[in-house]
């Protein structure tokens, strides 16, 4: 069956959350938003394209930083309202220069940063 990005369930803004996960390690790297066109562009090019809510424009991950994300596989959750992007990440995924955007844990009631920026 052919996939149609319009078959996904988008929120009122026309967006769906997309979780980027390293395809080799399983590490969750980041979460961002996609609209139907961003999904289509990602599938067409193999380069992950998100929708920037702040800039109201497409954002090809790594286009300016060089920290690109290559799509290995796109997965759809059971409700069709969230995507899992299995990717190959080049460099840090986070704008803070960390491998993952999820670098702060709450442990024993306190926040603890456990991941340093990459060199």
UniProtKB/Swiss-Prot annotation:
User: What are the entry keywords?
Assistant: Amino-acid biosynthesis, Cytoplasm, Histidine biosynthesis, Hydrolase, Magnesium, Metal-binding, Zinc
Chemical reaction(s) catalysed? 1-(5-phospho-beta-D-ribosyl)-5'-AMP + H2O = 1-(5-phospho-beta-D-ribosyl)-5-[(5-phospho-beta-D-ribosylamino)methylideneamino]imidazole-4-carboxamide
Q: Which InterPro entries match?
A: PRA-CH, PRib_AMP_CycHydrolase_dom, PRib_AMP_CycHydrolase_sf
Q: How is the cofactor bound?
A: Binds 1 Mg(2+) ion per subunit. Binds 1 zinc ion per subunit.
Main localization is: cytoplasm
The record lists the membrane-crossing segments as none
Asked whether the keyword NAD is assigned, the reply is no
Top class in the EC scheme: hydrolase
Chain positions recorded as Mg(2+) binding sites? 77, 79, 81
> What job does the chain carry out?
Catalyzes the hydrolysis of the adenine ring of phosphoribosyl-AMP.
User: Can you say what this protein is called?
Assistant: Phosphoribosyl-AMP cyclohydrolase
Which species expresses this protein natively?
Answer: Cereibacter sphaeroides (strain ATCC 17025 / ATH 2.4.3) (Rhodobacter sphaeroides)
Corresponding gene?
hisI
């Amino acid at each position: 069956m052919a996939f149609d990005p319009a078959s996904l369930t988008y929120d009122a803004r026309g967006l769906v959350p997309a979780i980027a996960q390293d395809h080799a390690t399983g590490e969750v790297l980041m979460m961002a938003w996609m609209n139907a066109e961003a999904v289509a562009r990602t599938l067409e090019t193999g380069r992950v394209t998100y929708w920037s809510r702040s800039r109201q424009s497409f954002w090809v991950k790594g286009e300016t930083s060089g920290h690109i994300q290559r799509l290995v596989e796109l997965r759809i959750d059971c409700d069709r309202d969230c995507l899992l992007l299995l990717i190959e990440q080049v460099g840090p995924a986070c704008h803070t220069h960390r491998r993952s955007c999820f670098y702060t844990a709450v442990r024993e009631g306190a926040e603890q940063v456990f991941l340093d920026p990459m060199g």
